[in-house]
């Protein structure tokens, strides 16, 4: 969502660059002797931003003062081992685990999802090796003082569609090392308007969203939509919290009843959006198994949701005991209901029409 919002905050750059990108990547337009559309968009964005700055409009927030001051970060610096900081952090372990466990699960699921996404685009990678490399390199980074874990980057079909291959990953790694060690990132940030890059991220998101529908059975579309709902709730709550925090208050201070009077069901957003990643997995699995008339498997996922909800991994802001007991109880009741459906009469599963194979990603995977 943020890339789209950034585009329309500075539409003279964002919308124009977005048009340049989708004209090439969706419309097949070729630019100036094969120059990549992303590079053309960034160049046009820089031209508009700096041109407007010299004319006094300052679209994109570029200025010579910022660019000049950014050169002060130039210099050669390499990561220094930080073993002491790593182990001294154990005194904060209880606080860290509240975030680390859900985030670790998210990173695992995201890596598996992205490997599957690559497979759907025609490139198969060994999942175990990918996850092992992901974890091992993250550990090395932590010992060097890096608080950010390595992640299998999202959007393989999109990068492949614009011509990215193994050299793209290698070049990215080399560039990140050079930019970081030489202190060039600040200069790049002061030279290139962020809004010129945002359309690329929006395009990747569009392609990933489309793939979720194109590469799954048509009958599973409702399940895909259902998995998005907890994330929308989490996003909505975050926007409300940040807005109230800037105003120096909070939802509890304002009052849930007052928020409800203007249509903001804050407690509902809080419950539904808590642990959105795991919630989406459970709800999506329930929906898929129900669509497939596999009631026993659907019923098996409900107790899983109950346990994770009880301990705060789902539908809660904190890990602990009895975080959302009423929601946990509802999942247990759902388990009995779904298991009972196994013995009820029900309509046969609709015949699947594999229309999703007409998409471009499917054509890649089905070519002889």
Regions found by a protein language model. Name each.
Residues 42-43, 103-107, 131-139, 173-177, ...:
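Transmembrane helix-bundle signature of multi-pass membrane transporters/permeases
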Residues 32-42, 77-86, 113-115, 120, ...:
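Hydrophobic alpha-helical transmembrane segments
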Residues 57-84, 243-271, 336, 340-368:
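Intrinsically disordered, low-complexity non-transmembrane regions of multi-pass membrane transporters
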Residues 49-56, 68-114, 269-281, 329-332:
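Hydrophobic, membrane-embedded alpha-helices of multi-pass small-molecule transporters
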Residues 324-337:
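Small-residue-rich transmembrane alpha-helices that serve as helix-helix interface/gating elements
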Residues 1-55, 179-325:
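Membrane-embedded alpha-helical modules
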Residues 137, 141-197, 203-204:
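Long, well-ordered mid-to-C-terminal structural blocks that present hydrophobic/aromatic surfaces
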Residues 93-166, 357-365:
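Membrane-embedded helical hairpins/re-entrant loop segments and their flanking transmembrane helices
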């Amino acid at each position: 969502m943020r890339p789209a919002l950034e585009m329309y905050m500075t539409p003279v750059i964002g919308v124009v660059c977005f048009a340049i990108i989708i004209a090439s990547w969706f419309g097949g337009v070729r630019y100036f002797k094969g120059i990549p559309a992303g590079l053309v968009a960034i160049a046009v964005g820089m031209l508009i931003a700096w041109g407007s700055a010299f004319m006094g409009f300052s679209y994109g927030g570029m200025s010579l003062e910022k660019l000049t001051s950014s050169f002060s970060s130039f210099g050669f610096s390499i990561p220094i081992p930080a073993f002491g900081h790593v182990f001294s952090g154990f005194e904060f372990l209880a606080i860290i685990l509240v975030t680390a466990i859900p985030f670790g699960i998210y990173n695992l699921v995201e890596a598996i999802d992205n490997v599957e996404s690559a497979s759907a685009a025609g490139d198969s990678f060994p999942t175990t090796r990918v996850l092992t490399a992901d974890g091992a390199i993250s550990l090395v980074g932590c010992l060097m003082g890096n608080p950010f874990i390595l992640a299998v980057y999202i959007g393989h079909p999109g990068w492949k569609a614009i011509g990215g291959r193994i050299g793209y990953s290698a070049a990215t790694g080399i560039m990140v090392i050079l930019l970081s060690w030489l202190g060039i990132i600040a200069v790049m940030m002061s030279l290139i308007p962020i809004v010129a890059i945002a359309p690329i991220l929006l395009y990747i998101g569009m392609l990933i969203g489309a793939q979720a529908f194109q590469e799954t059975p048509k009958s599973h579309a409702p399940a895909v939509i259902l998995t998005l709902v907890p994330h929308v709730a989490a996003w909505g709550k975050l926007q409300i919290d940040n807005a109230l925090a800037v105003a120096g208050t909070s939802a509890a201070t304002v009052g849930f009843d007052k928020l409800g009077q203007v249509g903001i069901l804050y407690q509902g957003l809080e419950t539904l959006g808590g642990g959105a990643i795991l919630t989406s997995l459970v709800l999506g699995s329930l929906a898929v198994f129900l669509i497939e008339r596999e009631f026993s498997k659907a019923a098996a996922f409900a107790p899983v949701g109950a346990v994770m909800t009880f301990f705060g991994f789902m539908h809660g802001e904190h890990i602990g005991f009895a975080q959302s007991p009423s929601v946990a109880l509802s999942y247990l009741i759902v388990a009995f209901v779904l298991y009972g459906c196994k013995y009820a009469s029900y309509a046969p599963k609709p015949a699947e029409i594999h229309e999703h194979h007409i998409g471009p990603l499917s054509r890649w995977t089905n070519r002889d």
